[in-house]
């Protein structure tokens, strides 16, 4: 599948929530940890899209981790270690159990840090993790524009 060109500068703020429109696959430890044709994605100015899969499409074992974070748009997130096949990734997935009303459709959907998985794909296209160690977006080759997260971009 060929993904359409998207300019991250055109993504909205506050962020938007929409169907991913493509099959999303997460691999870990030689196994498919999650796979969905019903994934959602969050789009925000200068960010790579963040993909969220329905819990029933996640085959991996999720082990709760201590600590929470708060997003001004989506609410409080909780984190999980992920175990699939022969692999285990620490604090590699998160969800919003009770998101803000605008993002209600995300409730309990799981997102994965691409850099902690063996591979993540959107529409058969392998992704790269969003730069930095904070954001969980997935970079695909169809994205143009500067993506926040790398050195010197944290403050804008």
Regions found by a protein language model. Give the residues of each.
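Terminal leader/tail segments of proteins
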Residues: 1-156
């Amino acid at each position: 599948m060929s993904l359409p060109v998207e300019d991250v500068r055109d993504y909205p703020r506050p962020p938007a929530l929409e169907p991913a429109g493509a099959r999303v696959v997460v691999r870990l430890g030689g196994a498919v940890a999650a796979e969905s044709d019903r994934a959602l994605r969050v789009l925000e100015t200068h960010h790579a899209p963040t993909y969220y899969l329905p819990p029933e499409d996640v085959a991996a074992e999720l082990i709760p981790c201590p600590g929470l974070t708060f997003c001004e748009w989506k609410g409080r997130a909780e984190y999980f270690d992920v175990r699939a096949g022969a692999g285990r990734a620490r604090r590699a997935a998160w969800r919003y159990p009770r998101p803000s009303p605008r993002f209600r459709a995300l409730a309990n959907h799981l997102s994965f840090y691409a850099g902690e998985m063996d591979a993540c794909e959107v529409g058969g296209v392998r992704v790269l993790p969003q730069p930095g160690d904070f954001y969980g977006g997935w970079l695909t080759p169809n994205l143009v524009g500067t993506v926040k997260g790398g050195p010197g971009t944290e403050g804008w």
